[in-house]
Amino acid sequence: MAERAPEPGAEAEAGAGGEAAAEEGAAGRKARGRPRLTESDRARRRLESRKKYDVRRVYLGEAHGPWVDLRRRSGWSDAKLAAYLISLERGQRSGRHGKPWEQVPKKPKRKKRRRRNVNCLKNVVIWYEDHKHRCPYEPHLAELDPTFGLYTTAVWQCEAGHRYFQDLHSPLKPLSDSEPDSDKVGSGLVAGSSDSSSSGSSSDSEEPPETQPAKASAAAAALTPASPTGSSGLITQEGVHIPFDVHHVESLAEQGTPLCQNPAGSGPEALETVVCVPVPMQVGTGPGTLFENMPQEALGEVVASCPVSGMVPGSQVIIIAGPGYDALTAEGIRLNVAAGGGTPSSSLGEEVPCAMMEGVAAYTQTEPEGTQHSTMDTTSIASIETKKEKEDLYMLKEEKEDSVAPELAELAATVPENAEAEAEVDGEELDSSEMSAIIYEIPKEPEKRRRSKRSRVMDADGLLEMFHCPYEGCSQVYVALSSFQNHVNLVHRKGKTKVCPHPGCGKKFYLSNHLRRHMIIHSGVREFTCETCGKSFKRKNHLEVHRRTHTGETPLQCEICGYQCRQRASLNWHMKKHTAEVQYNFTCDRCGKRFEKLDSVKFHTLKSHPDHKPT
């Protein structure tokens, strides 16, 4: 009897019923995530992916070893290293000479230090006041660098390394060619030209330490204070301005010591008088006063120049402040500064600009180079007088509080602006009255000091000390002591104490933040989305690995055979082919698949058999 073929309607109903049953069974098995693809679909996608990325895969052959070594030394990925080599090749094509592998990117040129406000006493006070709030150490003159012929750079530095560069120019402008003789003035405290200031200073390595303070004083005497207000006087450590009028300035030293010379043929416009004036009193009381820590014998003999008849306007007074004034008066030095006129110095007018030198060490009397006894003018030596009276030494007029207050307010208002502007702005144009530069340089220390390379320890040979784990069976090696201590405490002593509370998971971790990161898997929240295809992920590193499927980047590569992959797990699985036989001691109860670790079995069961209840 012939078999009757099934009717098409019944076959369609049976097919529909089977699909519905399959959907119900799939819905019953589905616990989380997207449904799994069939084996045929997975194989088809795998084949398409291989065809897609085989085109981009590059086999290095014999050059694989040098490539891996170059990548390890540079710390770059394969894509970045290849892009760098391609850029070098393009540069060679565009006209640069040399081989691509010999070309090194040029280092950016260091920006030259620009000179700003020359010899500006206001900036010195600003830097000193700001440095006093930042650092407990007192700055001193550390170096005089006569690198250029036009100016000498004075470096003020404290014990903490904070530096302040000051370019000391000659107070006078360069003279005309019709007066060549007036260009050469003695290199003492009389600064007649830029040649005198630069020739009078030498490097620190060519002179003994005893003469360095004297050299420093001679070079610092070439300052021309560019006070914004044009007033003369003393600016104290607290920023108080004390003006005074100069009537007559007389200085004396030991008999027979040459102090200055008045070259023949030089007119009054070729000379500038610089006088050292000691301050007879400390400004302020209590701790923090001017030079409170300086001993009485700190100031010895003072090198001073004599006032010359026909002194030109613009001459300056260098004030050497310190409590050793009594020692100076005991040596017979008399300096009379008062109001009035009638002396040769009265041609200066009512005001004479002055500069201040703080923290002055013991000064020794030295003879300037190139100064001859035979060429000294007897009239200049005759103007030096020796007297013992202390009453007529030095007169200071204290300014009233109402007149001091606006200057203090102005100085306080300009401190933060100048400090930040000089540290950041380099392209500002200078006023015509300011000849050159004072550079404000205080390195700002970080508020919270970072760990010095994570507590790395150097041995006697200057090499990094390696810390090997002392526990048996553990081959971990660390270069940072903190990392080594964390490994011993967490892995070998404390262990994995943080357990996942999710039912059926039970995974353990060393730290709470690791457990917190793991709990995102169970939450189902996918906050990391691919911009190209819109696929979402639970972790950021999963998204980064997925992006490589769009870019074709395979940054990981086997050092033995050259196999390239996108993620670390694939490389770890691949490396098992090159190692000894791995023991798969753990088997899945549902499908019989074997694993190396028990945690792998648990993860496989949760993902592949979600309907199975673990015992």
UniProtKB/Swiss-Prot annotation:
Keyword Zinc-finger: yes
Region spans: Disordered: 1-46, 93-115, 174-235
Subcellular location: Nucleus
GO biological process, one term: negative regulation of transcription by RNA polymerase II
Zinc finger (C2H2-type): 467-492, 498-522, 528-550, 556-578, 586-609
Residue stretches of biased makeup (Low complexity): 7-25, 192-203, 212-232
Main location: nucleus
Annotated tissue distribution: Highly expressed in testis and spleen. Moderately expressed in lung, adrenal gland, uterus, and ovary. Very low expression in pancreas, heart, skeletal muscle, adipose tissue, kidney, and liver.
Annotated coiled-coil segments of the chain: none
Keywords linked to the UniProt accession: DNA-binding, Metal-binding, Nucleus, Repeat, Repressor, Transcription, Transcription regulation, Zinc, Zinc-finger
GO molecular function terms noted in the UniProt entry: AF-2 domain binding; DNA binding; DNA-binding transcription factor binding; transcription corepressor activity; zinc ion binding
Pfam family, one: zf-C2H2
Regions of compositional bias (Basic residues) in chain numbering: 106-115
One of the record's GO cellular component terms: extracellular region
Described purpose of this protein according to its UniProt entry: Transcriptional repressor. May repress NR5A1, PPARG, NR1H3, NR4A2, ESR1 and NR3C1 transcriptional activity.
Subunit-structure text: Interacts with NR5A1.
Name by which UniProt lists this protein: Zinc finger protein 653
